[in-house]
């Protein structure tokens, strides 16, 4: 049994990681800003703190055998400084705390967005075949790229590191993406960008967690996966329109039937990016140029590097995942209403 710390253990993927690690017999502690009753139920210890506070992070990592660094500030828009503090400074604090406490293993949750390059497609490639993106105007992607580089550069004989890039995680327990999509669909405010024919990968939640456990089991100084990044998905690319509408159907929401052209959506995104900060409008920016590019571009990846280096094979197909989502959402009023 090991003592393992999960940053952001109260989130969607974080809870799946905590649940799986506890089931594997480990002592698990979550470091996050809030308090989550579900983690108490799982028997997970909780430490409240901010990743941007180096002393709090160093204290949390005392006596820890491995870290799953999953916490991040996500979202399509916001001040660069807020993303930099959470994603870059926070990650550097985790790395420094690993050094200070002699923690030998760090599994970092990254994102495929670090390779974003406008509308350039990524089709069937591994992470070592796709360079980091240029001009990452979205602060989330830009700061995650900086953080991932730092994590991989830190890999050495004392601290083994690996970065996983799960693509579009979905499934039961999602209290962010699917509920918002379903609400917009029911209100008639959801549009397809482009014709929706672009192939995209996605990752069922249990598969995303399993990839982390597989990497953890193989990670050690000098291991094949040490110091490397990997795309993670179900390995079942679907047209964007089909994926979105199958997810909506699973939560009893209407299909998307109307669309915006790329050019129109891109112009709207540019206007939103200008008006929201200028007028200090409340709420999240509804559309950005980065998001439009992501929605219209093929993004699907090779799982062969992850299979070869740490044995990752998706266990839950999209079809089975949708069935599980359908069963779960029928009991979850936040998604079905």
Swiss-Prot record:
EC nos: 1.1.1.412
Active-site feature positions: 140
Localization, UniProt: Cytoplasm
Family annotation (Gene3D superfamilies): NAD(P)-binding Rossmann-like Domain
Protein purpose: Involved in olefin biosynthesis. Catalyzes the reversible stereospecific NADPH-dependent reduction of 2-alkyl-3-oxoalkanoic acids to 2-alkyl-3-hydroxyalkanoic acids.
NCBIfam families: oxyalk_red_OleD
SUPFAM superfamilies: NAD(P)-binding Rossmann-fold domains
Cellular component terms (Gene Ontology): cytoplasm
GO MF annotation: an example: oxidoreductase activity, acting on the CH-OH group of donors, NAD or NADP as acceptor
UniProt: NADP(+) binding residues: 144
Any Pfam family hit: 3Beta_HSD
Keywords: Cytoplasm, NADP, Oxidoreductase
Species annotation: Xanthomonas campestris pv. campestris (strain ATCC 33913 / DSM 3586 / NCPPB 528 / LMG 568 / P 25)
UniProt superkingdom: Bacteria
One biological process term in Gene Ontology: steroid biosynthetic process
Chief location category: cytoplasm
Stated family: Belongs to the 3-beta-HSD family.
Subunit structure, as described in the record: Forms multimers. Forms a complex with OleB and OleC.
Record field: catalytic activity: a (2R,3S)-2-alkyl-3-hydroxyalkanoate + NADP(+) = an (R)-2-alkyl-3-oxoalkanoate + NADPH + H(+)
Name by which UniProt lists this protein: 2-alkyl-3-oxoalkanoate reductase
């Amino acid at each position: 049994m090991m003592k393992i710390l999960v940053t952001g253990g109260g989130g969607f993927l974080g809870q799946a990681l905590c649940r799986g690690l506890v089931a594997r017999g480990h002592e698990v502690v979550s470091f996050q800003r809030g308090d989550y009753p579900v983690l108490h139920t799982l028997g997970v210890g909780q430490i409240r703190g901010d990743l941007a506070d180096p002393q709090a992070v160093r204290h949390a990592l005392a006596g820890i055998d491995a870290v799953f660094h999953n916490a991040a500030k996500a979202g399509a828009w916001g001040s660069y400084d807020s993303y930099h503090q959470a994603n870059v400074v926070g990650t550097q604090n985790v790395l420094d705390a690993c050094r200070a406490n002699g923690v030998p293993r760090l599994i970092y949750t990254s994102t495929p967005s670090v390779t974003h390059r406008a509308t350039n497609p990524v089709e069937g490639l591994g992470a070592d075949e796709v360079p980091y993106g240029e001009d990452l105007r979205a602060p989330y992607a830009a700061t995650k790229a900086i953080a991932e580089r730092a994590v991989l550069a830190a890999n050495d004989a004392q601290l083994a590191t690996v970065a996983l890039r799960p693509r579009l995680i979905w499934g039961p327990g999602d209290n962010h993406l699917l509920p918002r999509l379903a609400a917009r669909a029911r209100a008639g405010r959801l549009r397809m960008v482009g014709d929706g024919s672009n192939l995209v990968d996605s990752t069922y939640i249990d598969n995303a967690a399993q990839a982390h456990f597989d990497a953890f089991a193989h990670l050690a100084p000098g291991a094949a996966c040490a110091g490397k990044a990997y795309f993670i998905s179900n390995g079942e690319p679907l047209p964007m329109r089909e994926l979105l509408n199958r997810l909506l159907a699973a939560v009893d929401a209407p299909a998307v039937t109307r669309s915006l052209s790329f050019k129109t959506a891109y112009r709207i995104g540019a206007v939103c990016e200008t008006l929201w900060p200028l007028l200090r409008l409340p709420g999240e920016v509804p559309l950005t140029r980065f998001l439009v590019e992501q929605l219209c571009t093929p993004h699907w990846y090779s799982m062969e590097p992850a299979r070869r280096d740490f044995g990752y094979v998706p266990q839950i197909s999209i079809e089975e995942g949708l069935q599980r989502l359908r069963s779960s959402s029928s009991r979850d009023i936040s998604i079905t209403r």
